Amino acid sequence: MAAACAGAFVAVFACTQIALAVFGNTKSVASNTLSTSTMAAPTGLAAAGGANIVLTWTATATTYATGYNVLRSSTSGSGYAQIAQVTPRATVTYTDSPSAGTYYYVLQSYFQNWISANSTQATAGVSTNTGYLPCTANAQDAGGDANGYEVSPGNACANDSVFAQDVNSGTSTSTSCTAAAKDKHRFYNYGFSIAASSVINGIQVRLDALKSGTGTVPKLCVELSWDGGTTWTTAKNTATITGSEVTYTLGTTADNWGRVWASTEFSNANFRLRVIDVDNTTTQTFQLDYVAVQVTYTPP
């Protein structure tokens, strides 16, 4: 019986009672009790996207844990695969640099071959951009002289120091971007290729321009349309235009011009850019070498 009980002890590390025969006497030994430990996952997982994805979390409460497994998926709630192992336990950040897209993350605490359950999920995306794309079409708009850039307007669709010109611009001395008496011109058909359901992060407009007339506060104002020119954003304006060609950039990679955009609104049928020439004189000549647009977005 003693041998059988000893074998059970080796197998399961416990024996409720061992009967020992020592010189014909029997002695009872108290039972042994095993405790269990559940390894805790880290808490508070968060993800911040952009050019890459930064994960942050609160360390596991399991003090003997070695570190963390980092798992990633392109599908919410499933399909996770381990992409990294982070040590020591006190580490609470990890930077991932996948290709553009939206990703889902969970963490596990680990010690040797033991792992915890998954943490809560966090999600973030890596953005990309279209690059600066030129217009391929243009049209004068109502306002001012009603002729916009009347001299070679197509020149503004190429970056070559050959200029479109708006001569003797406007019919009033107002310096407001919204004044009806200011010359306006539309530039469009940028040929954007943005994946459906992408999140639009920001829109930047590049204007290469100079002025060659009188007036003291010349500037270019820009409005954007998402419905073919029916509705427009609030205008943004450049600094004062000088007599030398300068590149002006309006908007940032995180500036959506006051609205939430859908990827479909950048089609050639929908997207329009309107340039409005403004100065405190009607004898100013605006020269525009290049109009280009860059869209920063996060694919689905």
List the predicted regions and their residue ranges.
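Recognizes extended acidic, P/S/T-rich segments that occur
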Residues: N69-A100
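Beta-strand-rich modules
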Residues: D96-S116
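Hydrophobic beta-strand segments within extracellular beta-sandwich modules
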Residues: A19, Y105-V106, L273
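Disulfide-rich extracellular domains of secreted proteins
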Residues: N129-P300
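Beta-strand-rich extracellular modules
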Residues: G24, Q108-Q112, I276-V278
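Extracellular Ig-like/FN3 beta-sandwich strand-entry sites
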Residues: A65, A100-T102, F266-N270
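Sec-dependent, cleavable N-terminal signal peptides
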Residues: M1-G24
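Pro/Thr/Ser/Gly-rich low-complexity, intrinsically disordered linker/stalk tracts
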Residues: K27-Y64, N113-T130
